[in-house]
């Protein structure tokens, strides 16, 4: 195999004797110069962590090409949002449509009005019948540039006691995934009833398995595990 090596011109002009047993490296083994990651890449990678965090719904307050108002849409799935546990029967990969109406405010940031639409296969909390739980809900959030100088943390800052405000340092993006996840989960459990007639009636007890064995709704199984510890 033909092998080549690189020798510095400074080495040729010096008086240092080069050993005849010099190991030659093929060009394929020469490493390329690594480029520094951008701040956004660093945030996505968790500040240098080898595990990449996949973000789905993001907005940047420093995006310069947008002015005034604009709209954007995201098409994801319950599995993408890690909400497949909400599905009680059927495929756990229902589509989720997230529409964002964004307005830029001079020297402030972005105000975002979001709308979430999806359908989840659920069991009625009254009659236990399967039904499609239609989700059509909205949220509002402000994305503001952060003025803090704390560089120790590489993740965007969340707005303290106000969950409707997200502070983001220059060069970073606001991650709206958790906001969308919480909105869907709370809306799903808020009124888990299949019809108006069930809403006006009393809950019905259904026996599962042996009549002397208590059954636990899987939605509360995690609370039961914590109680037993």
From Swiss-Prot:
The family this protein is said to belong to: Belongs to the DUF177 domain family.
Pfam assignment, any one: YceD
GO cellular component, one term: chloroplast
Keywords for this protein: Chloroplast, Plastid, Ribosome biogenesis, Transit peptide
Residue span of the annotated presequence: 1-42
Subcellular location: Plastid, Chloroplast
Protein name, as recorded: Large ribosomal RNA subunit accumulation protein YCED homolog 2, chloroplastic
Function description: May play a role in synthesis, processing and/or stability of 23S rRNA.
InterPro entries with a match to the protein in the record: YceD, YceD_plant
Source taxon at top rank: Eukaryota
One biological process term in Gene Ontology: ribosome biogenesis
